[in-house]
A protein has these predicted regions:
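Glycine-rich phosphate-binding loops of nucleotide-dependent enzymes
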Residues: 2-252
Length: 252
């Protein structure tokens, strides 16, 4: 078995008397699409923010390719190949779709303003165009991002995460607010990016999502969280057949 790309061990985070994450352990393998599900308040967002360097856990470690990155912030994690999207869109509404991707590619340069006004790297334009084509948003490439539908902006947001050739992409509720008709297309797109190295090395994904059909169809393995703890980890079929999960979360 391959060494894990991401390894989370004993992660804990409390807010006063509330244990948001209570000793979480899991691994993500190279090339794996790993889903995280659970009811509201199960600790998914706190876990996600810890992995992104947005908050500091109280205990435990986060390793990326064997390196302890627990104390690193978002910029340092991006430099090490971690891309991400959030529940709230991160697009620049007054900039064109193409310019949004070009700005995202320079995230490693520092602050938002230095990224916006830094001279572009050679080859970034071609990379942005390739992603625009892959995400099937070429017809709106020159439009301001704020003029697009929410679903189209979501695609731009995800495309921006791929401008740095990430080895690992963390997706926080990619289906939220997206037209149901676009959800299957989004799953197909993520599978293509997972399998096709044409735009860089093959990416792994950690996907936090409430849309159960999407998660079950897309992910290789799924982790179920309840009250800050891991209830189960397994394939979609194993999760479907887990009576403890059914009773606690999925229902009958």
């Amino acid at each position: 078995m391959s060494a894990p790309l991401l390894k989370v061990s004993g992660l804990r985070k409390a807010y006063g008397a509330i244990q948001a994450v209570g000793g979480v352990d899991f691994e993500v393998l190279p090339g794996e699409i790993f889903g995280v599900i659970g009811p509201n308040g199960s600790g998914k967002t706190t876990l996600f923010n810890s992995m992104l360097g947005q908050i500091e856990p109280d205990a435990g470690t986060i390793e990326l390719n064997g390196e302890d990155v627990t104390a690193l912030g978002p910029l340092e994690l991006n430099r090490r190949g971690v891309g991400r999207t959030f529940q709230t869109l991160q697009v620049f509404p007054r900039m064109s779709v193409r310019d949004n991707l070009l700005v995202a590619a320079q995230e490693h340069r520092g602050s938002m303003w230095s990224r916006m006004f830094a001279p572009p790297d050679s080859g970034l334009g071609a990379k942005a165009d390739a992603l625009i084509e892959r995400f099937r948003i070429g017809h709106v490439a020159d439009k301001r991002a704020g003029e697009l539908s929410y679903g189209q902006q979501k695609l731009v947001d995800i495309a921006m995460a791929f401008m740095s050739d990430p080895a690992l992409v963390l997706l926080d509720e990619p289906c939220a607010g997206v037209n149901p008709g676009l959800v299957s297309g989004l799953a197909r797109l993520l599978r293509e990016l997972n399998h096709d190295p044409a735009l860089g090395s093959r990416s792994s994904f950690v996907v936090i999502e409430h849309n159960m059909d999407f998660v079950m169809d897309l992910c290789h393995r799924i982790m179920v969280m309840v009250e800050g703890k891991v209830m189960a980890i397994g394939t979609p079929e194993e999760i479907r057949c887990n009576h403890q999960v059914l009773d606690a979360y999925l229902g009958n």
